[in-house]
UniProtKB/Swiss-Prot annotation:
Protein name (Swiss-Prot/TrEMBL): Small ribosomal subunit protein bS18c
Keywords (A to Z) from UniProt: Chloroplast, Plastid, Ribonucleoprotein, Ribosomal protein, RNA-binding, rRNA-binding
GO molecular function: small ribosomal subunit rRNA binding; structural constituent of ribosome
Record GO biological process: translation
NCBIfam families in UniProt: S18 (TIGR00165)
Annotated organism of origin: Pseudotsuga menziesii
GO cellular component terms given for this protein: chloroplast; mitochondrial small ribosomal subunit
Main location: plastid
Family assignment from sequence similarity: Belongs to the bacterial ribosomal protein bS18 family.
Record bears the keyword Plastid: yes
Keyword match Metal-binding: no
InterPro entries the record matches: Ribosomal_bS18 (IPR001648), Ribosomal_bS18_sf (IPR036870)
Localization (cell): Plastid, Chloroplast
């Protein structure tokens, strides 16, 4: 007689640890705008590059709006394209 080997069934219970939602660094009253320099400066690195969405903890829509606002501010000379080390 041939015996078959059965795998034990896995239980599909999830861990009961609560999932923490990360709060957005942009408040509900803050508007993403190229004129809002205090907000924009938080999302630019020391070299002047735009920080990624993972580093910023922004949603993809917020990151897209922030990128466009930073680029507009650079074109209008409100922000430098690169920060000099000197």
């Amino acid at each position: 007689m041939k015996q078959t080997m059965y795998k034990p069934k896995r239980s599909f219970r999830r861990n009961l640890t609560p999932i923490r939602r990360h709060l957005s660094p942009i408040g509900s009253g803050d508007r993403i705008d190229y004129k809002n320099m205090s907000l924009i400066s938080r999302f630019i690195s020391e070299q002047g590059x735009i920080l990624s969405g993972r580093v910023n903890r922004l949603t993809s829509k917020q990151q897209r709006l922030m990128t466009n606002a930073i680029k507009r501010a650079r074109i209008l000379s409100l922000l430098p394209f690169l920060y000099n080390e000197n």
